[in-house]
């Protein structure tokens, strides 16, 4: 079975961030300080290189941001500007990956929390920076709080032959383990594959203990070290896609 490893760094180290007046310096606040672009590119590349050299893990893709238009403080995060991300990708991260022999490692680009915003973000980046298409990127966004009408194609990326991924989704607000919920997610996956024409859809959390949210596919009996688990119905409906659509299959529109 082919396994594609990709990693997202939620925030750079605090010392490589800038903070507004009165803003508490933390992992969950602040913006990236572009003065540290080269050292951050080396930091990310070194991580990917270490996994390859020490464990034989080929990193398929790496992202230096997570939901870059939000730094909400509930978890680690960091604000990025659109042009700032494009400049870092083209001028620092891509050259550093290439320099260290990781030309095939893709840069997961975008990753905004709401899909429609990610579509706009990628479109703006490619319009203002045509050479970004040559940086071996994957255009990406998350699927939180996204209504069906906002599951749109990233046309600007697709026209340039850039693969499009929906890199994170779950129900982060309610808990439902029923088959009705499973069918809701089956439709959601189907819409991303057909309406948005994505090349991949990624669920947020595989196995964990949840009490008030629908973040998981396997419910464990403890948060950290568990002794048992059970499968939630959406495990089966989502699993149909990964089971019956092998890598390299092509979607043909009728």
Language-model features, listed with the residues they occupy:
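Glycine-rich active-site loop/lid that clamps phosphate-bearing ligands
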Residues: 243-249
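Aromatic/acidic polysaccharide-binding cleft in carbohydrate-active enzymes
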Residues: 166-239
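Alpha-helix termination/capping residues and helix-transition junctions
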Residues: 55-56, 129-133, 194-195
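Flexible loop residues that form catalytic
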Residues: 67, 144, 206
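Substrate-binding cleft and catalytic face of glycoside hydrolase catalytic domains
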Residues: 1-123
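Structural recognition of the beta-strand scaffold that forms the well-ordered cores
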Residues: 4-8, 60-64, 106-109, 138-140, ...
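Conserved small/polar residues in nucleotide/adenosyl-binding loops
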Residues: 250-254
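Noncatalytic carbohydrate-binding groove/subsite architecture in carbohydrate-active enzymes
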Residues: 49, 76-188
């Amino acid at each position: 079975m082919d396994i594609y490893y990709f990693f997202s760094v939620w925030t750079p180290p605090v010392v490589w961030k800038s903070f507004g007046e009165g803003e508490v310096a933390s992992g969950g606040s602040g913006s990236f300080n572009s003065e540290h672009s080269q050292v951050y590119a080396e930091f990310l590349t070194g991580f990917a290189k270490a996994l390859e050299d020490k464990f034989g893990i080929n990193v398929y893709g790496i992202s230096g941001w997570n939901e870059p238009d939000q730094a909400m403080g509930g978890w680690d995060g960091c604000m990025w500007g659109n042009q700032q991300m494009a400049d870092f990708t083209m001028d620092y991260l891509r050259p550093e990956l290439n320099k260290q022999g990781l030309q095939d490692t893709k840069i997961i680009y975008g990753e905004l929390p709401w899909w429609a915003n990610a579509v706009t973000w990628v479109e703006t980046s490619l319009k203002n920076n045509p050479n970004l298409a040559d940086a071996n990127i994957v255009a990406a966004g998350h699927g939180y709080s996204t209504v069906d009408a906002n599951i749109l194609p990233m046309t600007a990326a697709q026209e340039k032959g850039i693969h499009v991924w929906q890199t994170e989704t779950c129900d982060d607000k309610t808990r439902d383990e029923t088959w009705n919920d499973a069918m809701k997610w089956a439709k959601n996956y189907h819409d991303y594959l057909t309406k948005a024409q994505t090349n991949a859809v990624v669920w947020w959390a595989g196995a964990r203990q949840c009490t008030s949210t629908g973040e998981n596919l396997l419910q464990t009996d403890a948060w950290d070290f568990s002794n048992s688990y059970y499968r939630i119905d959406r495990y089966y409906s989502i699993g149909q896609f990964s089971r019956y659509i092998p890598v390299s299959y092509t979607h043909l529109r009728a």
